[in-house]
Every structure is written in structure tokens, then in C-alpha cells.
């Protein structure tokens, strides 16, 4: 199974704080609640292109 790295960006400030490895079979974007160091709180992070 092939995989690739993608970035997760904060929906509030737009900073790209995290990178994750996903399989190429995944069609929908990943949305996860994570801690943003710039905002100082937990916010929703979404997969960027």
C-alpha cells in the first residue's frame, strides 16, 4: 500500500503545525482536533493539499 505525507493546518490561524502519513486510497480530507501552538488552544486542523 502506497502512502504519502500531508500537512494539517489550523482552521483559525492557518499555521501548518503537523504532518501525517496517509494512504493514497483515502479520498476525503482528514479533520482532527489538535493543539495549535500559535493559538494556544485546541482547534480543528484540516488536511491541506
Swiss-Prot record:
InterPro entries: Ribosomal_bL33, Ribosomal_bL33_sf, Ribosomal_zn-bd
Sorted UniProt keywords: Ribonucleoprotein, Ribosomal protein
An MF annotation (GO) of this entry: structural constituent of ribosome
Coiled-coil ranges per UniProt: none
Keyword Ribosomal protein assigned: yes
Record-linked Gene3D superfamilies: Ribosomal protein L33
Any GO BP annotation: translation
Entries under Pfam families matching the protein: Ribosomal_L33 (PF00471)
GO CC annotations, alphabetized: cytoplasm; ribonucleoprotein complex; ribosome
NCBIfam families given in the database record: PRK00504.1, rpmG_bact
Family membership noted in the UniProt record: Belongs to the bacterial ribosomal protein bL33 family.
Protein name: Large ribosomal subunit protein bL33A
Native source species: Leuconostoc mesenteroides subsp. mesenteroides (strain ATCC 8293 / DSM 20343 / BCRC 11652 / CCM 1803 / JCM 6124 / NCDO 523 / NBRC 100496 / NCIMB 8023 / NCTC 12954 / NRRL B-1118 / 37Y)
